[in-house]
Each structure stands twice: as structure tokens, then as C-alpha cells.
Design a protein with these regions (language model features):
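Anionic ligand-binding catalytic core segments
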Residues: 1-65, 69-177
Length: 177
């Protein structure tokens, strides 16, 4: 993402600005305009926001522009599979989120996903995006027990700043359940 946006590594970004700039650059790229590569804006926006929800739920604060990439194949341009995904809120040095939504959508570890969906209404219908996020949120129910079954250390599972113990309550507060 940093290379596409021509930004220096480590610079703080705002999600909505990044999304719009990426959409513009990709839609106006030679690959799309001249070669006819397919780029689904709604699918991209949905996946971007869904990945941020997953980062938040799993305590992965390391969401800088080098941890997101694109690939192109015969079906078009899309995000690569998720990589470099770990509960970085557990890092003793404290890894802050470098890409944020900004207030009033994100403040003090709380998120207003309804407002996030409205912010992106020029790219996707807010109801559609919120519905897709609700589906992802439902899949996060029971995450704590599934992670324990897979052997995630208790030190991570119980660390308050990672926040795995109260995911359903947070999802309800954020309007996703």
C-alpha cells in the first residue's frame, strides 16, 4: 500500500482516505483502463473493513501499509491473502495502530462501525457493508474457545490489552451483533 500511495514507511494513515486513494489509483491504472483487468470496488471496500475488524478482534495493531498488498490474476485485481497477522497489542514495546479511522469512528479503542459504513457510502451501500460486517462478527463468536483449542498461550488469551476475552460484548457495543 505504501508503494502504491507513494508514502514513506511508517507514516500514519486514515482508512477512508487510503481506501479512496487506492480505488482511484487502481480504477485509473493502465491495468484496468487499457488491459481491462476487473476491479470490484465494493468487494475491495468490504474486505478492507472486514480485515480491520479482524485486526481489532485479534489484537493485531500492526496494520501499517506494508502489511497489505494486491495481486492480479486472470480474475482481476484484489487483495492478497492476509499475512503478518499476530496479536501485536501483546508486544511489550506497544505497537500502535498506524492506520486509523479517526474520530468519531474510532476513539480510545472503541469503534462505530455504523459511522464507518456511512463514511464509505460513496463507494458501497452502508447497509450492504454493515450486513457483511455483521456476518463476519457472527463468525467471531466463540473465537476465544477456538483459539484455546488450538493452543494459543494463556498469557495471550488473558492479556487485557489484546482483548480476546470479551469479543462478543465489544461487537455488540460497536453495533455488529
Amino acid at each position: 500500500v505504501y508503494s502504491i500511495l507513494k508514502r514513506a514507511p511508517g507514516v500514519r494513515l486514515r482508512h477512508a482516505d487510503v481506501i479512496r486513494e487506492l480505488v482511484s489509483k487502481i480504477e485509473n491504472s493502465y491495468t484496468v483502463k487499457e488491459q481491462g483487468a476487473y476491479f470490484n470496488v465494493e468487494a475491495f471496500v468490504t474486505e478492507w473493513v472486514r480485515r480491520d475488524l479482524l485486526n481489532i478482534a485479534f489484537g493485531n495493531s500492526d496494520n501499517h501499509g506494508r502489511n497489505t498488498a494486491f495481486f492480479r490474476d486472470e480474475s482481476g485485481i484484489k487483495l492478497t491473502p492476509i499475512y503478518d497477522f499476530a496479536p501485536m497489542r501483546a508486544d511489550p514495546e506497544g505497537v500502535p495502530r498506524s492506520t486509523v479511522w479517526g474520530e468519531p469512528m474510532e476513539s480510545g479503542g472503541e469503534y462505530n462501525f455504523g459511522a464507518i459504513c456511512e463514511e464509505l457510502s460513496d463507494l458501497i451501500e452502508p447497509e450492504q457493508l454493515l450486513g457483511d460486517l455483521n456476518t463476519s462478527a457472527e463468525q467471531l463468536i466463540g473465537l476465544e474457545s477456538r483459539l484455546r483449542e488450538r493452543g494459543v498461550p494463556d498469557s495471550i488469551m488473558t492479556m487485557p490489552k489484546v482483548g480476546l476475552a470479551n469479543i462478543p460484548e465489544k461487537l455488540k457495543r460497536w453495533g455488529l451483533l
